[in-house]
Amino acid sequence: MIPAQDITGLILAGGRGSRMGGVDKGLQTFNGMPLALHTLTRLQMGGGVGQIMINANRNLAAYESFGASVWPDGLADYAGPLAGFLTGLEHCETPFLVTVPCDTPRLPLDLVPRLAAALEAENADIAMVAAPEIGKDGQVRLRPQPVFCLLRVELLESLVRFTQEGGRKIDAWTALHKTAVAPFDLPHDDPLAFFNANTLAELHQLENNPA
């Protein structure tokens, strides 16, 4: 098993928050606490990381008050979560980086160990979450959740090259590397663990649906 001190957690809070009316999503309140602080607390409680960073592009002092180092995108114009991956890898001082978005306050406490186990089992470069999702046909299928990733820091050079060539899609980049999948469909897994609140209405819906 990969020791916790070899893994840095990265909370992705650098988006525009367009579907929330342009607000800074990570600072929106969920059950009395900012979303990003919920995420940080869950990572700490899980014990799978040695340190935590936050990727944010505004209100940096507010994020710094959570006690983590904060780094803005190196790419311009809110280039998306892959820009956050790049920022995290550039500043990561451990062999592995795990990425999580700021808007999933119910992420599993065992997220990091399960990603690490999947990566080691397949000797992969990347491990990615797959979570159950109900399709339009009513069938439940496992769907990749590419913003929940465990990455080897040696991938930095590859990501620099990919973004310099104009690449911005996570799945297009991860497809270039051996990627393991960690399914989160066990009976005890929270079905809303990876539900990301894109609108204020969805955030309130999640608040009213306790785990």
From Swiss-Prot:
Source species of the chain: Albidiferax ferrireducens (strain ATCC BAA-621 / DSM 15236 / T118) (Rhodoferax ferrireducens)
Subunit description: Monomer.
Gene3D superfamilies cross-referenced by the UniProt entry: Spore Coat Polysaccharide Biosynthesis Protein SpsA, Chain A (3.90.550.10)
Keyword flag rRNA-binding: no
Free-text domain note: The N-terminal domain determines nucleotide recognition and specific binding, while the C-terminal domain determines the specific binding to the target protein.
Subcellular location: Cytoplasm
EC numbers on record: 2.7.7.77
Family listed: Belongs to the MobA family.
GO BP field: bis(molybdopterin guanine dinucleotide)molybdenum biosynthetic process
Any Pfam family the entry gives: NTP_transf_3
Binding site for GTP: L12, A13, G14, K25, N55, D73, D103
PANTHER family given in the database record: MOLYBDENUM COFACTOR GUANYLYLTRANSFERASE
Function according to Swiss-Prot or TrEMBL: Transfers a GMP moiety from GTP to Mo-molybdopterin (Mo-MPT) cofactor (Moco or molybdenum cofactor) to form Mo-molybdopterin guanine dinucleotide (Mo-MGD) cofactor.
A molecular function GO annotation: metal ion binding
Enzyme class: transferase
Cofactor: Mg(2+)
Primary location recorded for the protein, binned into one broad class: cytoplasm
Name assigned to this protein: Molybdenum cofactor guanylyltransferase
Keywords noted in UniProt: Cytoplasm, GTP-binding, Magnesium, Metal-binding, Molybdenum cofactor biosynthesis, Nucleotide-binding, Transferase
InterPro entries in the cross-refs: MobA-like_NTP_Trfase, Molybde_CF_guanTrfase, Nucleotide-diphossugar_trans
CDD domains xref list: MobA
